[in-house]
Amino acid sequence: MEMFGKIACFVVFCMVVVAPHAESLSCGEVTSGLAPCLPYLEGRGPLGGCCGGVKGLLGAAKTPEDRKTACTCLKSAANSIKGIDTGKAAGLPGVCGVNIPYKISPSTDCSTVQ
């Protein structure tokens, strides 16, 4: 029985050490993923590859914390990049056929995002 306990402890140890560590979403990932949207949001070009970035963001933001981070990054970008059409930004998820649980807007309260 003692040998079984040692083997069980070793197996658990290996699972903890070998298990991949989930990384949080970063603002850099959010902004680089949505960079193809900038010409569209500034009224300078077509939608192009933008929807791929929007869908990628939705897939990457798996946890409530990731969604809050993404929201905060998008809100910051909307406030700092001049010339963005906020109506187009808010409508981006619908145009791309995805459901993001918050409005892309400078006025969004990201602390309420789940």
From Swiss-Prot:
One of its GO terms (biological process) is lipid transport. It comes from the Eukaryota. Pfam families: Tryp_alpha_amyl. CDD domains: nsLTP1. GO terms for molecular function: lipid binding. Residues 1-23 form the signal peptide. Induction: By abscisic acid (ABA) and drought stress. The keyword Transport applies. Keywords: Disulfide bond, Lipid-binding, Signal, Stress response, Transport. Disulfide bonds join 27-73, 37-50, 51-96, 71-110. InterPro entries: Bifun_inhib/LTP/seed_sf, Bifunc_inhib/LTP/seed_store, Plant_nsLTP. Plant non-specific lipid-transfer proteins transfer phospholipids as well as galactolipids across membranes. May play a role in wax or cutin deposition in the cell walls of expanding epidermal cells and certain secretory tissues. Belongs to the plant LTP family. This is Non-specific lipid-transfer protein 2. It comes from Solanum lycopersicum. The lineage of its organism: Eukaryota, Viridiplantae, Streptophyta, Embryophyta, Tracheophyta.
